[in-house]
């Protein structure tokens, strides 16, 4: 699993591609381990969740992904050769803080972020300021 972290100020206030807001140092932690295809019976049937300070913001499954795993592998294979050990990030379930209405929620220093994928484990990060 990958924590799909976004620096929204980079994405919203600095125009251009959104990828720059996902490419900061320490963003995109992977783990607690990687699994191979023989270790997951159905990659389109995994629960996904994320909590901030104990409040669950995201709770979904891989069934609701815009693009399935097989499609993503086939599509990306058209542009470059995938090798054993390559990692493809598939995105995030519904419920991102920026989409909270009427007032978006953004991470602040010191907050505890926990996320997990059923059967694959959990991650825990404490947010810090870059200043």
Where are these regions (language model features)?
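Extended Lys/Arg-rich, glycine-bearing segments that form polyanion-binding/interaction patches
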Residues: 1
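Catalytic-pocket segment enriched in acidic/His residues
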Residues: 8-131
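Active-site glycine-centered loops adjacent to acidic/histidine catalytic or metal-binding residues
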Residues: 4
């Amino acid at each position: 699993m990958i924590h799909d972290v976004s620096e929204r100020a980079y994405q919203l206030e600095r125009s251009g591609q959104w990828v720059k807001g996902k490419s900061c140092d320490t963003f995109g932690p992977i783990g607690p381990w990687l699994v191979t295809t023989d270790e997951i019976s159905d990659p389109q049937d995994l629960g996904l969740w994320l909590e901030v300070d104990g409040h669950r913001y995201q709770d979904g499954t891989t069934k609701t992904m815009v693009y399935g795993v097989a499609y993503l592998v086939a599509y990306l294979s058209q542009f470059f050769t995938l090798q054993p050990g390559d990692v493809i990030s598939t995105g995030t379930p519904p419920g991102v803080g920026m989409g909270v209405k009427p007032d978006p929620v953004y991470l602040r220093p010191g907050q505890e972020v926990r996320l997990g994928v059923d059967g694959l484990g959990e991650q825990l990060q404490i947010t810090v300021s870059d200043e």
